[in-house]
Amino acid sequence: MTARTRKHRILVVDDEPSVLTTYRMILEQKGYEVVPAPSAQEARRVLEGDSFDLLLCDLSLGEKESGFEVIEFARGRQPGLPSLLLTGYVGKNISDRAQGLGISVLFKPVDIQEFLGAIRAHLSFREQKAASSQWIARSEESE
């Protein structure tokens, strides 16, 4: 399988089993490879050994850590990892903190088309950024 035809890998973190299953099913139907993580601890374990094209993470994980901490950990392991924070809480402090960290927020209940559109946009941006970096590297080599 070439790099262009490989499935995008998405890590989905949510502590509610039904929500995690729903996201997984929707994304797999659209052709994505999904790795579900039911806790911040499991997400960290998975991130220790795998790389992903996108991270979808619930804000409230029912633990000591929030989705912000999971995303920060992931970006420490994989700088530049596109991330979407999902939350049912509407508040300026959440939006401001996310914006400051370069994290997009989707508010629950999530509209499926908005959900899929945000995922496509983040993956497309990541691919464009990678292609641009490769082009710059080749240009510098030929000088």
Task: Give the location of each predicted region.
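Short amphipathic alpha-helix used as the core "switch/output" element in two-component signaling
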Residues: R45, F68-G80
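Non-catalytic signal-transmission and effector/linker regions of two-component phosphorelay proteins
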Residues: M1-L11, G76, Q113-E143
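Conserved phosphotransfer microenvironments
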Residues: D58-E72
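Acidic, metal-coordinating helix/loop segments flanking the phosphotransfer/catalytic sites
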Residues: L11, P36-L54, G62, G76
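A Lys-centered signature of the CheY-like receiver
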Residues: K108-P109
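Negatively charged, flexible loop motifs adjacent to catalytic sites
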Residues: Y89-N93
